[in-house]
């Protein structure tokens, strides 16, 4: 392999990126600068610098991207109502473009020759990282070890690490592939690869209680939204990061947001994962219910179509594209009236709407009541039905004529 002077490595401290440091030095005879994008993984950052240096990196950047992640990536996606294949709240998908953008910025500042990532050649993340890099530096060399090295499995990785004294905290029995940020925690691999196996929730879950261990009494919370963004919890104003942290704690306690899913990957195969998204699931439910109160029918129905496309774009690594940006502008316009307060009941994995109000509510009890009212003339419906049903009547009469042989 050609010698490189300096390589920027997207570094998490996990198994993949830990062994990539010595592999890069052995194969490219280069300086390795590790970059960790802090998107809210918290305790996973402990001891990371010491580990990176000990493994062979010349330095480690720990970039605090959490605020930008929540405000510029998570909240706009909530506003879009984007859910991939009806289940996945895109926890890994929208983190990768942000990290990729920052990798390019550091690579330029350091005068690096290449950017390296530890994504498997079977996964979606290789696409997400590399499209982000190409969006900001189309000429940057990208190294993807999983596509070129002789290591073929997680077991091979562990053996490689042990042979080079790379410090790792996992073992062969609990070697789930995980991804964690302030939004979610994903679990893949091992027994989860067989869809007939029930997940061992008591062993897997880290952010959440299992249903069985959730409290036997419900928890009530109140969320306040302004223009589609949650701004307060139980009447207390909070910044976006703090609010999401608090919802993660409350939701996790009540077993909210645990998803076992078989999804269609961008690269063609199906994969299975268990996702923990406690706070995010609460926000999606609250936001969607408030939209039901505040959006008119045509906007709401059209936005459902946009939500599906937006989810595909994010999942497929197309965050930095004209279409995603254009859709975000449309969505932003729809959120101008999504302001109000919603009370939620959380109980053993369930979220129940317990009442909501909005100054922009389009719900009129005066019109909708089953009781007596003075504003709606029910006789008006007759003319409406006559005109609305006219195509049906014309078609029915045409078939009647054909049957009679008179047409």
UniProtKB/Swiss-Prot annotation:
Q: What class of enzyme is it?
A: ligase
User: Which reaction does this enzyme catalyse, per its entry?
Assistant: L-citrulline + L-aspartate + ATP = 2-(N(omega)-L-arginino)succinate + AMP + diphosphate + H(+)
* Entry-linked SUPFAM superfamilies: Adenine nucleotide alpha hydrolases-like, Argininosuccinate synthetase, C-terminal domain
- Enumerate the Gene Ontology biological process terms: argininosuccinate metabolic process; L-arginine biosynthetic process; urea cycle
Q: Localized where?
A: Cytoplasm
Q: What is its EC number?
A: 6.3.4.5
* Family in the record: Belongs to the argininosuccinate synthase family. Type 1 subfamily.
- Could you tell me what this protein is called? Argininosuccinate synthase
Question: Which gene specifies this protein's sequence?
Answer: argG
